C-alpha cells in the first residue's frame, strides 16, 4: 500500500472539488485522510487457532454488543454499530476477546455489512469446527443518512446462521432473546 499515492489522490480529489487545500483547516487533510484509509485497509488476523480444548462445554456461548465499524465499498463512507455472536462449541472454545478480534478483522478494508456478517459466521464455523454459529450485526450507514434517502437514524440488521442453529429454533430464540435482554453497560 502506498500512503503517498493515497495522500496525492486525496489532494487531487479536494482540488477537483474546488476546495482550498492551503487553508488552515485543510492543509493536513490529505495526510489525515490517507492515514485513515491506510489504517482501514491494513489487515489484522484474528488468530482463531489458539483455543481451549474441552469436552465439557456444549451450550451456547455468546458475546453481544461488540462495537464495530467499517467502510462501505459502494460509497467509501463509514458504517458503525454492534455485532452479536453466539456459537455452540465442539471440543474447542475461544477466549471471548477473540470474538471481538474476529469482528474487527472482518471489518477491515472496504466491505458491505452483509459480507462482514457472513465472513464472521463462516470463519468461526469453519476454523473452530463448532456445532453452530449465529452472527447478527446492527449498523447505521452514513451513506444512507448523508446521500440518497437521507434516512438519518435508520439502521440495518443482518444475520448469518450456520450449523445446528439452522434447525434448532429454541437455540436461535435463546440467542435472539439474549441480544434484546440487555445487560451490564
Can you name each region flagged by the protein language model?
Residues 1-185:
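A domain-level signal for the structural core that forms small-molecule/cofactor-binding pockets
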Amino acid at each position: 500500500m502506498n500512503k503517498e499515492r493515497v495522500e496525492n489522490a486525496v489532494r487531487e480529489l479536494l482540488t477537483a472539488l474546488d476546495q482550498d487545500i492551503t487553508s488552515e483547516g485543510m492543509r493536513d487533510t490529505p495526510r489525515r485522510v490517507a492515514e485513515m484509509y491506510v489504517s482501514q485497509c491494513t489487515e489484522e488476523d484474528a488468530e482463531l487457532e489458539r483455543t481451549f480444548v474441552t469436552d465439557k462445554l456444549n451450550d451456547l456461548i455468546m458475546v453481544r454488543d461488540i462495537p464495530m465499524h467499517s467502510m462501505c465499498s459502494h460509497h467509501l463512507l463509514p458504517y458503525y454499530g454492534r455485532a452479536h455472536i453466539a456459537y455452540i462449541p465442539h471440543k474447542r472454545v475461544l477466549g471471548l476477546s477473540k470474538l471481538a478480534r474476529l469482528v474487527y478483522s472482518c471489518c477491515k478494508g472496504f466491505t458491505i455489512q452483509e459480507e462482514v456478517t457472513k465472513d464472521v459466521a463462516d470463519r468461526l464455523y469453519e476454523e473452530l469446527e463448532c456445532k453452530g454459529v449465529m452472527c447478527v450485526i446492527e449498523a447505521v450507514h452514513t451513506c444512507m443518512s448523508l446521500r440518497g434517502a437521507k434516512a438519518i437514524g435508520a439502521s440495518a440488521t443482518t444475520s448469518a446462521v450456520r450449523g445446528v442453529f439452522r434447525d434448532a429454533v429454541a437455540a436461535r430464540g435463546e440467542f435472539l432473546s439474549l441480544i434484546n435482554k440487555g445487560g451490564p453497560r
